[in-house]
A protein has these predicted regions:
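Single conserved hydrophobic/aromatic residue that forms the stacking wall/gate
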Residues: 1-12
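Mixed-charge interfacial surface used for oligomerization/domain docking
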Residues: 10-168
């Protein structure tokens, strides 16, 4: 179970399930298709702060403090085991947004559905949306504000990017 990606990934899974039900698929077909689809939804994140992750034991407090002092943003993904995998560290928002677009390319995104969820950072979410649409012709991008547990971990300035790869 990829618990880290539950919020954004579940949105696409619910939509996909609704589509399958509307098509009149049988229960066994739906189960098989949902298991297949689950493998093709992914989550990337950009965090401006690691403080709450440190408080909950996901990163060491010294690492969180050092990142804050140096203005480092962490770009990562949800692993298959539900852990946070750090892909890279960048300085500044623009570098983080560029890196997200590069990671999308590397992880098989072509032009499917992509959802950007921001935590008090609508300007960065809009910039990322425009960057994605410029690179991936026909991309279906929507934006919302983080809520609940996602906003706690993303913290102010954080972005979560849920997307379907080319095989979805």
């Amino acid at each position: 179970d990829r618990s880290v990606s539950r919020g954004l990934g579940d949105v696409y899974k619910r939509q996909h399930l609704r589509d399958l039900l509307a098509e009149g698929k049988e229960f066994d077909e739906i189960c098989e298709e949902m298991l297949r689809y689950h493998k093709h939804t992914h989550l990337l994140f950009s965090l401006e702060s690691l403080a709450n992750l440190a408080r909950n034991g996901r990163v060491k407090p010294a690492v969180a403090a050092m990142a804050r002092m140096l203005g480092i943003r962490v770009i990562g993904q949800a692993s298959e085991a539900g852990e946070l995998d750090v892909l890279c560290k960048t300085r500044g928002e623009h570098g983080a947004l560029e890196r997200i677009v590069l990671e999308l390319k590397e992880h098989g995104y072509t032009n499917g559905r992509l959802h950007i969820s921001h935590c008090g950072n609508p300007a960065a979410a809009e910039r990322l949306k425009h960057m994605v649409k410029a690179v991936f012709d026909g991309a279906k991008v929507d934006i919302s504000e983080c809520g609940g547990l996602c906003s706690y971990y993303a913290e102010l300035g954080g972005l979560l990017v849920g997307y379907e790869d080319a095989e979805a």
